[in-house]
């Protein structure tokens, strides 16, 4: 997808905020713990290749990604620190990962057997992390016998280096710690079955650290907090207070490209879902659902100049319209998303409007949007 650098619409990413969030996370670790910055999904929409060096400078000890291709992107960006893929990859890609010093997760004995054939053929050793399903229900070993079989298979097997063992918490961002405690107990049980001792045991995610639920983890996988966003932010929920202040890094700005007056009874947008109740001023903004600004944003208020104005009519593929209180000139700045967490158009408020989480909103902003990096 081409990046539209010649239109007046861009995501602004505050590098000073990214640095500060990374430093704060690093400072909050216990002695000996490593900080692995999670930059999957293009750093939650913020730009992984651009931000990873910034995080590295601010103290990152390694990086986590969702898939091998994301790890390869970091290597091309000259990142040399450890990279862990969190999602399962085809066994056929084991050699490519090993050749680029990228660690892969393991969830089955069958995968190991297939990967070993590939590695033996190329004369390579792969760093692996054993994934444990302690209660997320997603990937990982959950049955004792399966895990014991893998443990036995890895004894003396030089095709693999058991670098880590990990799990992921389903509810570390909840005030109710009962399920969190259950997962910790289940993980420790699985750990007791392992005689091939990993270099790193890691369970802590952003929520576990921000809400002081650290479980003696060698690595902290710090994700959404890097971008200044509170993981405890489901729609309608009460945010848990983080252990340190977070600084949102993303804002989304554009401008009015066209302003016109319409008369009473005139329709706006596909399906004419807005009908003017009187003579009205309508402004057009050159952003649409093809950029990730989806149709459900109809009715949401964006900041035009100093005034919050509702989106009227259905959001189009490449444009949307706003109802203005009066005539304003084309070229007037429009702030779609504010980096101020208290603003009515913050990423959190946008997520509330869409009945989702801010993770999803940030990730849906795609590569057609230019990303401008400020405050270097």
Swiss-Prot record:
Residues holding substrate: 138, 317
Pathway(s) this gene product operates in, as recorded in its UniProt entry: Amino-acid biosynthesis; D-alanine biosynthesis; D-alanine from L-alanine: step 1/1
Any one GO BP annotation for this protein: D-alanine biosynthetic process
Record EC number: 5.1.1.1
SMART domains per record: Ala_racemase_C
Tree of life domain: Bacteria
N6-(pyridoxal phosphate)lysine carried by residues: 40
PROSITE patterns recorded: ALANINE_RACEMASE
A cellular-component GO term for this protein: cytosol
The reaction(s) this protein catalyses: L-alanine = D-alanine
Keywords, in A-Z order: Isomerase, Pyridoxal phosphate
Single GO MF annotation: pyridoxal phosphate binding
Main function: Catalyzes the interconversion of L-alanine and D-alanine. May also act on other amino acids.
Alphabetized NCBIfam families for the sequence: alr (TIGR00492)
Similarity remark: Belongs to the alanine racemase family.
Name recorded for this polypeptide: Alanine racemase
Gene: alr
């Amino acid at each position: 997808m081409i990046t539209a650098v010649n239109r007046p619409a861009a995501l602004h990413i505050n590098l000073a905020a990214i640095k500060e969030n990374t430093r704060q996370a690093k400072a909050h670790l216990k002695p000996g713990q490593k900080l692995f910055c999670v930059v999957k999904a293009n750093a939650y929409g913020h730009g992984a290749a651009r931000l990873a060096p910034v995080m590295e400078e601010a103290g990152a000890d390694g990086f986590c990604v969702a898939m091998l291709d994301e790890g390869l992107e970091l290597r091309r960006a000259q990142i040399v620190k450890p990279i862990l893929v969190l999602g399962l990859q085809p066994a056929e890609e084991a050699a490519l990962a090993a050749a680029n010093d990228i660690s892969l997760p393991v969830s089955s004995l069958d995968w190991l057997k297939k990967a070993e054939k590939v590695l033996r053929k190329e004369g390579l050793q792969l760093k692996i992390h054993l994934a444990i399903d302690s209660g997320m229900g997603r990937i990982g070993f959950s049955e004792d016998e399966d895990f014991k079989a893998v443990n036995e298979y890895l004894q003396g097997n030089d095709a693999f280096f058991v670098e880590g063992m990990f799990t992921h918490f389903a509810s570390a961002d909840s005030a109710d710690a009962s399920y969190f405690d259950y997962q910790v107990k289940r993980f420790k049980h699985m750990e007791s079955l392992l005689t091939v001792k990993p270099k790193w045991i890691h369970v802590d995610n952003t929520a576990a650290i921000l809400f002081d639920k650290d479980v003696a983890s060698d690595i902290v996988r710090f994700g959404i907090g890097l971008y200044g966003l509170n993981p405890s932010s489901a729609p309608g929920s009460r945010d848990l207070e983080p252990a340190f202040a977070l600084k949102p890094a993303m804002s989304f700005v554009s401008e009015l490209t066209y302003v016109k007056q319409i008369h009473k009874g005139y329709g706006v947008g596909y399906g004419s879902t807005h009908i003017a109740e009187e003579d009205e001023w309508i402004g057009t903004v050159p952003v649409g659902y093809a950029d990730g600004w989806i149709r459900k944003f109809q009715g949401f208020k964006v900041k035009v100049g100093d005034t919050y104005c509702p989106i009227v009519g259905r959001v189009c593929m490449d444009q949307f319209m706003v109802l203005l209180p009066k005539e304003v000139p084309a070229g007037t700045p429009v702030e779609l998303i504010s980096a101020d967490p208290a603003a009515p158009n913050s990423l959190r408020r946008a997520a509330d409007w869409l009945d989702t989480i801010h993770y999803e909103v940030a990730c849906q902003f795609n590569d057609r949007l230019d990303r401008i990096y400020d405050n270097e």
